[in-house]
Amino acid sequence: MTDETLTKPTQSQAAKIEQTFGTDGIAPMARPSRTTRFFMAIVAWAEKLNLKYAKFGNPPVYDNATFPWTREIEKAWPEIRTELDRVLLRKNELPAFQDISTDVRTISTDRQWKTFFLIGFGVKSKQNIQACPKTWQAVQKIPHLKTAMFSIFEPGKHLPAHRGPYNGVLRLHLGLIVPEPGEKLAIRVKDQICHWEEGKVLIFDDAYEHEAWNHTDKTRVVLFVDFVKPLKYPARFVNWALMNLAFFTPFIQEGLGNHKEWEKRFYAEAETLRNRPGA
């Protein structure tokens, strides 16, 4: 699933150079408040702890054997794909990622990256879960789950190089719809080119620079999951505290509110269609 294009860095020093600290790689805010600057300093300090106390090191892309539960996720692929197919019947009504999480506008402003959240930042989407119970059952096998959604890349979509805002989580992709030809569809994480495969898991650290593209003429879909990075004490405790504090930040609260409004409209329209005479 991966092609190493350059020599691997050492685990510690190279990771410190390549990973995000604080707000590196994030569009700067105009005149950040004293509170914001204080929080950013804490995040930068926590990220250094996360690198030092990472339980399984800090590779850009992980060996799936590191996480034995990935086999259970892959076994659930046929049921997840069946539920996805039902969701895609209303693909045109699904929100673009930036409609939910407005900070995504720094890397995507079109309608070619759509989402269907089951859980975001630890908050469940009850109606979406009811629509995809087998998918929800599968992701419960992932320890310390934070986010799970269907990530839908339309033909021609290219997500530019960027870094995640914090290195306290890892990202999982399960290939659900992966069109051919494979060489026109990939994700680069640092210096590794990774190719999705249907029914196969890919785990990477989004704190490294990464970009993704779909240069085929068909839609690509993956199950997109964020889970807490396995850490040793004291980083594990600090990370837990920051994750809980982050829930109250304005951009996460805004995202949760945006999703709640979309969900309300989406299922109200579905109910109207069901109640239409002759439906």
What are the residue ranges of the model-derived segments?
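Short, conserved beta-strand element in jelly-roll/cupin
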Residues: 152-154, 165-181
